[in-house]
């Protein structure tokens, strides 16, 4: 199959999960937390996108993003210092109202006009809380072949012994571990692929 990633826009949410590591993000965000003394968490997702042929990447920041800007610079290290596409760091304010976003839907609302101007047919969205090398090429090809509106990635990992029989309920989700002794759980890794027009249409319907 022809590499569809050249027709994909990458969107990264660098502040996701900041609230889970408050002591580490007093002066930075999740994406700029050091990893192995040499890298930052954003490096893994950004490099994965670039290595798969995605050359137009937007990082929608919310707060404490100066360290991220210092680290990324113009994007030259990733060959993203371009006149067309390249690396875009989007500030946390929309054109219609001055309000810092609190979630991914509001973050997308801040760049809605930007999305409308993009030429890419597909959008790949990711957080920066996982250190991994991910094959976005395979994911997007599977997305196109399936004809799905949205494709989400997950991984399988063992469930710790102490939580295999636990149940938790929150305002956001319900999940149960190992009612029948199951030892493997499917964990959503917050990587998504969709059509760019679908992304815009869903916001206009539900969020505008």
Show the residue positions of the predicted features:
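Unchanged
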Residues: 1-208
